[in-house]
Amino acid sequence: MLKLYYARPSIYARPVWLALLEKQLPFELVPVDLGGQQFEPAFLALNPFGHVPILEDGDFRVIESLAILDYLEAKYPTISLLPTDATALATVRMVQLVALNELLPAVVKLLMQDQRSDQLSAETEYAQLRATHTLTFLESRLGEAPFFAGEQLTLAEIVAGTLVDKLPDLGVPLTSCPRLMNWSERLLARPAWQQIELSPAEWLTFKRRMRVMPKVWQRRRRQRMKALAQQFSGSL
């Protein structure tokens, strides 16, 4: 059986979890505590970079969200989450990459902002503008269709759909993109989306954790650099 190492709030793990549900594949969830478990030797033996998700399929192990999504689509093509039409496929890939390369960095920056402050930093303002610009692009690509590939739910929804719905709570409303807002609401009504939905308490805890993550990352980076230096010096 497929095994997914994940954390419920993980921005990277949630699309894989969602794809498994939408494809109606049997799988086992293995929760990982991102408070430090990802840096323990047992986990680093699974992924030397110390992050989720990880997918195990028998003896084969895959890391990185996009690689896992492509693996699932190639290995388990029914139910399909990719169109075969060239234009639709290009649209899906554009949405996936724009969501990860443009929208996700903005979301992460907004999650890290100090929401107790009355004044937005220049970085936060840029993140909001970047998110708004990306939403406008997605609105134009969606057009009047129910999904980015027309009538078929695809990896475009799987990736972008796990980010868009959280933006209003981060200070970026969807009201200027009514088609995208309706699209997001339809996705949230799907059983798979409801299954992965974070409770208000989980979302609040995740936001609080993200605000302290820069300090955690700095500490973990120093620890990792020390461990890597010892590893390479011992191999010389």
Name each region found by the language model:
Residues 20, 192-193:
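Short beta-strand edge/turn micro-motifs at domain boundaries
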Residues 91-94, 182, 195:
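Short, solvent-exposed alpha-helical surface patches in well-structured domains
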Residues 37-39, 184, 204-205:
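Generic structural signal for helix capping and beta-alpha/helix-loop junctions
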Residues 1-129, 139, 214, 223-236:
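GST-like domain detector, emphasizing the conserved glutathione-binding G-site
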Residues 33, 155, 200:
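Short, solvent-exposed turn/loop segments enriched in Gly/Ser/Thr/Pro and often Arg
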Residues 45, 189, 198:
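Phosphate-coordinating loops and pocket residues in cytosolic domains that bind phosphorylated ligands
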Residues 63, 99-191, 233-236:
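GST-like fold's C-terminal all-alpha helical module
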Residues 193-228:
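Terminal-tail/helix-coil boundary detector
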